[in-house]
């Protein structure tokens, strides 16, 4: 059974994105369907069938050339009192979870470690991330650890930032200001870097915190365990490492 991976989807979108920016190609956004549905309370769901496509074209009233475009992601505003999930590369539903946020400063962060109480239960975020360190994830006083990704540029915010979506882009070496910060973030990204640890089974019978050993073909990963009532409830990463 085949799976259409996110990497495949990204490659496809990139081809469309690049194609749409060619001076020899034109992409249009159309509006139509002025006549009422047979049942206004039960509008049919589009199926993408050949018939649906034909009817949509026949019902076009106007079309506008798309001269500017951007990749976007679902917008999740950072809000005090909200529980956020740390990014998990083994979570099949990660795209539906709030593992990244955008703040009122238009800074975008990814959560690499959520906060938990002494019993290991997730707690809410109460301290807004505001750092722009392009190299390191930062742990805040509420226990959440955030990695700065980028700041939405003013022009991108004006063109593409909406209540539901936020623009995403790649920075290049010619940029300055927040664009240069994002370029530094991109260059500092290390595939396979350990940024957080998730406890799936805390075991039992511990009289003191066990030593944590991270095995892999990288270097520098170090972590510390914390126990409550003889059970491991947290493992805190002591540093960002390439393991």
Labelled PLM ranges:
Residues 1-108, 112-243:
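Feature for peripheral, non-core segments
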């Amino acid at each position: 059974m085949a799976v259409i991976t996110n990497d495949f989807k990204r490659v496809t979108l990139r081809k469309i994105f690049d194609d749409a920016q060619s001076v020899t190609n034109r992409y249009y956004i159309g509006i139509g369907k002025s006549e009422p549905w047979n049942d206004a309370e039960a509008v049919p769901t589009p199926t993408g069938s050949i018939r649906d496509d034909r009817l949509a074209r026949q019902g076009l009233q106007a079309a506008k050339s798309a001269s500017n475009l951007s990749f976007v992601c679902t917008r999740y505003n950072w809000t005090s009192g909200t529980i956020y999930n740390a990014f998990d590369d083994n979570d099949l539903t990660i795209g539906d979870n709030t593992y990244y946020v955008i703040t009122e400063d238009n800074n975008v962060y990814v959560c690499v470690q959520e906060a938990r109480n002494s019993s290991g239960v997730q707690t809410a975020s109460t301290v807004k991330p505001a750092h722009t360190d392009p190299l390191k994830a930062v742990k805040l006083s509420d226990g959440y650890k955030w990695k700065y990704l980028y700041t939405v540029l003013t022009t991108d915010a004006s063109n593409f930032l909406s209540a539901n979506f936020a623009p995403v882009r790649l920075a290049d070496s010619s940029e300055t200001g927040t664009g240069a910060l994002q370029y530094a973030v991109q260059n500092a990204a290390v595939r396979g870097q350990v940024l957080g640890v998730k406890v799936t089974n805390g075991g039992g019978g511990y009289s003191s915190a066990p030593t944590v050993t991270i095995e892999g073909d990288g270097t520098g990963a170090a972590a510390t365990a914390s126990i409550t009532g003889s059970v491991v409830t947290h493992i805190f990463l002591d540093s960002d490492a390439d393991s």
